[in-house]
């Protein structure tokens, strides 16, 4: 089994072939099996367009996209690709189709003709993994935004994908809802080994990833660990992005003459550094 699960090679795509500008302009990147990768970028940079290529919702105009070595342009690979890569979108209401939580989680499995006993097991497992088992008999419209998004995640997880693509899946949630969803995502990644690619504009979420890609004007312009990327605060800001609050605080303290170590990106590190200075 290949260590690389997702690959883009010189990927070019535009929504209107009669217009000169490309939404993706020569993207080359890889995602390794089991990684948690965050993809950042200002609005219109191409990050959601890239995400849709990994599930073959969109196909390259030029270049190639491979999912576990399968070319997304090959029609006979489409079923296997979508079994391998599941997607969760921004609005959970657009993905929920049933009137009872457990029926919604089972929806795709029913369409695939999965035997009832296996379906029951997979649905229960997925709801427990997503932390919504207690809501299984409730109507989705009575749940909070974060709970609905976890229902959508459970529906994808029940398909047993190797990779989960989150296309701004926390964008419409309040802070508590975002926290609930991210706890679920980290559990799926760290405990179950599911590869995660998260398209996000929340820097604190990206700071928890294994690796960060920053996109601008249809290409990847920065790549590295969260520390490597967010330590370059001026470059990140020049791309019309924020930095994690802890990194911003660290910069302000340095400007005020307080010696702070490089690479601080979370509040715990910042608090520890200040504690060491005050001892």
How should each PLM-predicted stretch be described?
Residues 63-73, 81:
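Conserved ABC transporter NBD signature motif
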Residues 40-42:
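The feature captures the beta-strand-to-loop junction immediately N-terminal to the Walker
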Residues 55:
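Helix-to-loop junction immediately C-terminal to a conserved catalytic motif
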Residues 139-143, 147:
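Conserved ABC ATPase signature
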Residues 117-135:
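Conserved ABC ATPase "signature" region
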Residues 164-167:
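Catalytic Walker B motif of ABC-type/P-loop ATPase nucleotide-binding domains
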